[in-house]
Amino acid sequence: MKKTTRKQKRPLLAILILAVILIVLSVISIGIGALYISPDAVVTNLLGLDHSFEFIIQQYRLPRIILAILAGAGLAAAGAILQGVIRNPLASPDVVGISKGSGLAAMAVILIFPESPVYVLPFSAFAGAAIIAVLLLMIARKKSIQPSSLALSGIALGAVCHAGMQYMMVKFPGDVNAALIWLTGSLWGRNWEEVKLLAPWLLILFPIVCILIPKLDLMSLGDELAQGLGENANRLRFILIFTAVALAGSCVAVVGSIGFIGLLAPHIARRLTGEKAKYLLPASALIGAIILLIADTLGRGIMPPVEIPAGILTAVIGAPYFLYLLKFEARKQ
């Protein structure tokens, strides 16, 4: 009994520690930039006890930090869901092409219809992601397909989408600078408007994810077991993938194509909390938020006032890890 209690406490302790790390990093990150602000000055400002750097913190840095936390958590949760549903450790929104699909659709709105209202972006991004997801589901229905093959199929679809983005930048050069910044994945210039754009989506989707947590554990065990317990496996798979696509699409629409968070975060979380979705999903979301926050902070702090896009830094970390996973899966097979 005591051993069981200890095992249950370990994942909860890991989640608590991750939450504390995220809070501490957020305070530090707010202070880093062309003008350094000490952590104690940040805290006193946030508590309303000091107004020395109020404009910089409240209007420039705080919305950016909140957006990094929201987007990182959303992308990581989407990756954890996809890995559980597809039962593929290589699955993540960017690896299987979902992020590229949403990116292509969002860029079409940015370049072809520049006068479109900003709230159109998440819907267009979701539509693009959904098309890629449907194509992947058609590929995944082949029972003989290996995890590495599905990942490579996603990479191929992503390459096609990326080629489409490059073509649009050549064809519609008017807003190409904004498109390039968005394409690399960056939080530069983001403000409360983007927070207001992304937050409602996540406020709707995260409660849905919480409701679906027991179903995700069921799906990870296989379709036959799910059917035996009275669940419609195909319908459940559709709902879970729909939720993951909506999470990824809304995040990509606002912060651009930031890669590998959906791949890295669930793998790190699995080592800390195990496979149970009730621990894995919140841990993944927290780790995803931490990764994107660190990437954005480093991007601002390495060469101020010049900024390195967060998407470049996540790619530098994530690409070697993806190659390692690809090699590991090939050895298993």
Swiss-Prot record:
One of its GO terms (biological process) is siderophore-dependent iron import into cell. It holds the Pfam family FecCD. It is found in: Cell membrane. The chain crosses the membrane at residues 12-32, 65-85, 95-115, 120-140, 194-214, 238-258, 279-299, 306-326. InterPro entries: ABC_BtuC-like (IPR037294), ABC_transptr_permease_BtuC (IPR000522). Keywords: Cell membrane, Ion transport, Iron, Iron transport, Membrane, Transmembrane, Transmembrane helix, Transport. The keyword tRNA processing does not apply. It is a multi-pass membrane protein. Its main location: membrane. GO terms for cellular component: plasma membrane. One of its GO terms (molecular function) is transmembrane transporter activity. Belongs to the binding-protein-dependent transport system permease family. FecCD subfamily. The complex is composed of one ATP-binding protein (YfmF), two transmembrane proteins (YfmD and YfmE) and a solute-binding protein (YfmC). Part of the ABC transporter complex YfmCDEF involved in citrate-dependent Fe(3+) import. Involved in the translocation of the substrate across the membrane. This is Fe(3+)-citrate import system permease protein YfmE.
